[in-house]
Structure formats: C-alpha cells, structure tokens
Amino acid sequence: CMFPTISGFTRETCDTMVGIGSTKGRTIMPDVSVPRWDAVDIEALCKGAGLIAFDLDNTLARSKKPMKDDMAKVFSVLTSLIDVAVITGGKYALLQSQVVDRLTGTANRSRLHLMPTSGTRYYRWNGRRWTLVFAHDLSDEERAKAKEALERNAREQGIWYSHACGERIEDRGSQITFSALGQLAPIEAKEAWDPTDEKKRRLTQAVAAELPELDVRPGGASSVDISQRGFDKSFAVRELAGTLGMEVGRIVFIGDRMEPGGNDYPAALAGTRAVKVTGPADTVRLCDGIIAGLSR
C-alpha cells in the first residue's frame, strides 16, 4: 500500500486507517511520507473511501485560473460517485470562478463541499444556492495587527516591492493573506519568486514571533496566510469528517504542497489518505483511476 508511510505500515493495515485521526481530538500521525499520485495503489486508495478532497491552486487549476475542460469533466463525474471537497487558502469568490462555474451537467452539487480560506469557512448547496454553514472570522483587532505585522516585516526583509499586481494584503475575513507580488501576478512569476520557500519561511517566522495567538503559515507559491490558531487544513478535514459522520482516515486528500511546511501537509498529518501531485495534469490522471476504482 502506498498511503502515507508509518513504521510498520503495510497493505494489510489499510483498513485500519479509518481509525487514524480523531475528528474530535488533535491526534496526528508522526513521520508522514506522502506518496506521489503515480505510486499509489488505486484499489487500496478507493477501498472504504468516503470523500475525495482537493487543494485548488496547482492541484485542480493554475493559480486564480478556472479548471480546464478535462479537469471539469472528471471532477464533475466524481461528485456523482462520492462526496467531494475543495479546501483552499483562497477566498470563496475564487472557488466560484475556478470550480463551481466550470461544473458540467453530470455534477451533483449536493455532494460538493466548499471550504475556502483554509477551511475557516464552509459552504454547502441547499438545492437552490450555496449557503454558509460556519465561519471562524478574525476580530477587527486581530486583522489590524496581522496586516501591520505583515507589511512592516515584509518591508524590513526587502520583499515589499514598489509595484505589485493587485492587492498585496487581502482581508478575507477569516484569513489575512500576504501576496509578495500581488494577488493578480502571473503564476509563472509567483512560482519563480521563492522556489526554495526561504522567503516565505523567513517572513512567517518573523510575523509568528509577534503574533503568538494567531496561526501564521506559508500559503501558495508567493503568499503567507494568517488565521485563528488551529485553523489549517488539518482542522478542515477533521471538521468535515465530523460534520459528515465519518472518520478522517476515510478522506482521500490530493494536493501539491505535501512536504513538511507545505499548506497541504497538515491534512496528511491529520490522518487522511494523502496523495501528492505536481499539477492539474497529474490530478486528471489520478482522478481517472479513482473514477474507475469507484465504478467497479
């Protein structure tokens, strides 16, 4: 079995994964190694799965771009077979334009779960429209402190540039996001800006030291996110599992930033069946396999 590996973990223990990671506690798995999409055992991955969860940017689509036709097709088919979630650091409006607006006629919206701003907000389809189930918003004081600390430290570190494409600091209510090049910068520029994640880590550490009551973490290729402490993708998958009455170990989580420190990695630590992709093309091929596995 090629799920996240723990010492002594074998294919025969796949069924026990449904008990790993409590939806009520804070139990995590140590020493998680997340397999690539082309190294997973599809049959084992699908066995007992209750939900397929995805990161958005560079997993379902390029940053800020809508899903392409091939992705929209397989994603929509998946919602007709199993519950599907999208958990992203982006705001709700981006989920609408990148995912919801691209759904095909085969999609079952009632089985789709939208969790923007790293899962601090949760939306469900009620048959007529998308409704907010919960929101864990920052206070006015917390938002002000986060914005001030981000700008000041970014300036001190030389990464507050004279020109930016779009907003540099975006207030998403439940999350404050700093984008070094601006929210609307080309994806190629974002990906080239900090290939080793050193700049994001340095800014994250400086701001976190000033705001110990908040959770400060690297976001996408050129961003840093701030939310209430404990509200990352591990919280999101536990909260979703609890809402749906399933164990976290029945959730398959697919993302591109599955290395320690990556914003998808907390979902692996929470006990999901985590899988790493390097881009939407990988995700399409993985989904083809999952659809075949679920259809048997």
Where are these regions (language model features)?
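Conserved acidic, metal-coordinating active-site core of Asp-based
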Residues: 157, 161-252, 263
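An N-terminally biased module of ancient metal coordination in phosphate/nucleic-acid-related enzymes
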Residues: 62-63
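Active-site phosphate-binding/coordination module
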Residues: 66-165
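Non-catalytic pre-domain segments flanking phosphatase-related domains
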Residues: 6-54, 70-77, 101-102
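Mg2+-dependent phosphoryl-transfer enzymes with acidic/Ser/Thr/Gly-rich catalytic loops
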Residues: 30-36, 41-51, 67-68, 227-229, ...
